[in-house]
Structures are given as structure tokens and as C-alpha cells.
A protein has these predicted regions:
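Transmembrane alpha-helical segments of multipass membrane enzymes and assembly factors
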Residues: 94-104, 123-124
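Transmembrane signal-anchor hairpin modules in multi-pass inner-membrane enzymes, especially those
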Residues: 1-67, 73-80, 100-114
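Alpha-helical transmembrane segments and their membrane-interface exit regions
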Residues: 36-41, 86-93
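Active-site-proximal flexible loops/turns
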Residues: 22, 75, 81-82, 126, ...
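Alpha-helical transmembrane segments of multi-pass inner-membrane proteins
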Residues: 38, 62-70, 90, 106-144, ...
Length: 165
């Protein structure tokens, strides 16, 4: 399960499936598949814990998300939000249960830091020549960005800040 979690995290952070040159070459959605593989390993794991206070809060948030769409008259929006938010809930459950030892937490932190270093190297190249190896240009002519969820320079900066020890 832990290896699948690390591969999923690599796909979330490095995002090779979102590189413009590679978008059409991946036939299958790698990131959701890797999350499902990690979840299957978690299902067969003997240690499942749901006693952390974050679980009821997450469930409450999920319910409010659905009910708010229903009360706004858009029941289809509730169904759409299940599809968008369910992977977030699943990733939380898998990671919360899979990171049960200090050594695993340190390895995941190392993956975060190494991925941030890769994205920083991309930003350096992007700043020097105007475009990074992903094919993404500078945002607003001066701000580095990456692909996918890090297309917003502020989100990319938050990753960098989160990885500072």
C-alpha cells in the first residue's frame, strides 16, 4: 500500500500525465488508477482506524457540500460534487491510515521535498529561457508555473513553502 501511495503522490506532484507533449500519450488516467490501487491495498490491510477527529469533520463537510447543492435547486450539482470530492476523501483515508509509522511519514516528507526541488528546477529553467521542460511558459511574463494543479503560481508557491523545514 505504501508504494502505491508514494507513486500516487508522485503523480499528484510531478504530474507527467499533464505535460502538454504527453497528454495524448497516456491512454489511461494514471492518477486515479494509482489511488484506486492504494485504496484496494488499504481495504485488505488489517489496520483500519477511524478514530481521528478529522473523520467526522470530513464527513460533515461532505454532507454540507451535497446538501448545499440540493437546497440551491441543483441536485445534479450534488452528484457532480461527489465525483469531484470523493477522490479527495479516499486519498485522505488512505494516507491517514497508511502513514502509521514515523519512518513512512519521513519518506513521504522526502518525496514532497524532492518533488518540490524538481518543480523549482523547472521554474529556474522557465525563468531563464521563458519556457520549462513541460512546455509551460511564464505566467504574466514573470511568474513561474507548472502544469495541472500548479498552473497557478500561488499554488506552486504554497507547495514550496510547505516543504521548507
Amino acid at each position: 500500500m505504501f508504494v502505491a501511495m508514494m507513486l500516487y503522490l508522485l503523480l499528484v506532484l510531478i504530474r507527467p500525465q499533464d505535460y502538454p507533449a504527453l497528454v495524448d500519450s497516456f491512454g489511461l488516467p494514471l492518477q486515479p488508477i494509482m489511488l484506486i490501487i492504494a485504496a484496494v491495498f488499504w481495504l485488505f490491510s488489517p489496520r483500519k482506524q477511524f478514530d481521528a477527529p478529522q473523520y467526522p469533520v470530513l464527513l460533515l463537510f461532505f454532507c454540507v457540500l451535497l446538501v448545499s447543492h440540493v437546497f440551491n435547486g441543483w441536485i445534479g450539482g450534488a452528484v457532480e460534487q461527489v465525483g469531484k470530492f470523493a477522490p479527495v476523501v479516499l486519498a485522505f483515508v488512505v494516507f491517514a491510515n497508511g502513514l502509521d509509522r514515523r519512518s513512512r511519514i519521513l519518506k513521504i516528507m522526502a518525496v514532497f521535498a524532492l518533488c518540490a526541488a524538481v518543480l523549482a528546477a523547472h521554474g529556474i529553467e522557465q525563468r531563464q529561457i521563458g519556457v520549462g521542460w513541460t512546455g509551460i511558459e511564464l505566467s504574466q511574463g514573470t511568474r513561474i508555473q507548472y502544469v495541472g494543479i500548479f498552473n497557478d503560481p500561488n499554488d506552486l508557491g504554497m507547495l514550496f513553502v510547505a516543504c521548507i523545514p
